[in-house]
Amino acid sequence: MATEKPLLDVANLSAAYGQVRILQDISFTLAEGESLSVLGANGAGKSTLLRAISGLMVRRQGSIRMAGEEISALRADEIVHRGISQVPEGRRLFFPLTVLENLEAGALALRNTGRAAEVKDALAAVFDLFPRLAERRAQISGTLSGGEQQMLAIARALMSRPRILLLDEPSVGLAPKVIESLFGVLHTLKGTGLTIVLAEQHVPMALDLADRAIVLRLGRIALSGAPAALRDSEDIRRIYLGG
């Protein structure tokens, strides 16, 4: 019986900015519907890993496969068309545009065939998930609260109907209650079968969401395993404290 290919297969991935190597020999696989939390102190390489997967990091070596197809040589826009969407740190919305206009911009990756119907369906899905955005669809996005802007950034990434969602530090700068709501949304998305790769500093909530987790240190995987095994690990505490 043939073994089903993982949805995402990262093998021996290394990446550099100029002559400075940021990632070294990163390998992991994800099945469809799995969630992976990427942990580590500031500067460990979490954001770079997501940028490498999404095609935004050009100087990279190794293999990145999606459903068996090699995508490591593709441009970022081509990777979006393959079904990988990223929510970058800092939201990066079109702040002078309305909520609806931001969402429509996120739908540009949809195929032209039947695009109007796809956009309509995608809008209905994100407004069902984010009812407050539906109420504010005509509001200028720059006037939203920080939490609403982060929800809009996630909703915009979902407009392309991705199979894999990459999230880079989505809780940064948010109040505790907003972070709780944010992770509630992520758990809902996980329940739909979406595959999630989350780079996050909020370790307890990141582990609660994850099926598996990796901890980066100096660009390498220092720890990996089930969240329950990592949650009380002395090793993870030492990594965060710089030991």
What is each stretch, according to the model?
Residues 18, 59, 74, 99-121, ...:
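ABC-type ATPase nucleotide-binding domains, specifically the catalytic core motifs of the NBD
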Residues 39-41:
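The feature captures the beta-strand-to-loop junction immediately N-terminal to the Walker
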Residues 54:
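Helix-to-loop junction immediately C-terminal to a conserved catalytic motif
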Residues 62-70, 82, 118-121, 225:
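Conserved ABC transporter NBD signature motif
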Residues 140-144, 148:
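Conserved ABC ATPase signature
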Residues 157-158:
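ABC ATPase C-loop
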